[in-house]
Amino acid sequence: MMASRLTVGITTRNRPGALATCLASLAGIRHLVGEVVVFDDGSEPPADGKGDARLIRDPSSPGYIVGRNRLVREATTDLVLLLDDDTRVIDASAIERAVEVISGDDRVGAIAFAQAEADGRPWPVTLQPSRAARPSVIPSFIGFAHLLRRELFLRLGGYREEFIYYGEEKDFCLRLLDAGYRTVYLPDALVGHVPDAAGRSRSRYLRYVVRNDCLNAFYNDPLPRVLWTLPARFLLYFRMRHGWRIHDPWGWLWIARDVLAYAGRTRDRRRPVSRASIRLWVELKKAPRPYA
């Protein structure tokens, strides 16, 4: 039995069935878990934490990014496993291995898991955090399931809550990389992900992905890089909208207004990472580094 204890934090909104399945799946890692905390993002009717889970409810529905920050702050353990409500632990050894890696190497700031069907079949490699076939250092995890160091996460400021939905992982992992830490991907550490359609909107997803990529560039990219990365990321909206066949003719205007508004109000929060960190991020995206 492993000595390390962790907090499992789950964000949920209007998915009672998925949440119940996720909570039930934690039975296999009971020996690792010190506590389970659920953030209810304004579900109607309110979510039921069930069992020993501690429930935190915010009826204002501020978004899952705010929820994740709250979960990490509320955690009472050094390690925090954050899960979406439509995930499920299908292999206890995946979580055990992740805890072993992050506990054994002070340079590791986060662990990325591989996405799988409920029966354990891995998702296509194009939908994974990386194409790497062995444990590797990569730029970023995917937020559906990830393991963090609580103290480090809070020291770096956590997720930017103005992102609201989507893209917060890349922004955080870039700051983590700039602070000298690494994100390690374990391709054999599978976590079930059974996306629930409740509350999903393709046009909202597109808007927030592009908006937050623009804000990521604004906050983190050094000069002169930001002068071309910010407009380039904005223009991706049109390519993505066409490629995904999403009818959202005025989404670009919403994005432009929102980015300009946030840039004007929060320009004092701009903290560009080093050029060396940008180079390393690009290198890891092209060629993940094997992690031994």
Set out the residue ranges of the language-model regions.
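Non-catalytic, C-terminal membrane-associated alpha-helical segments of glycosyltransferases
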Residues: R225-A292
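Short, acidic, metal-binding catalytic loop of nucleotide-sugar glycosyltransferases
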Residues: A24-V33
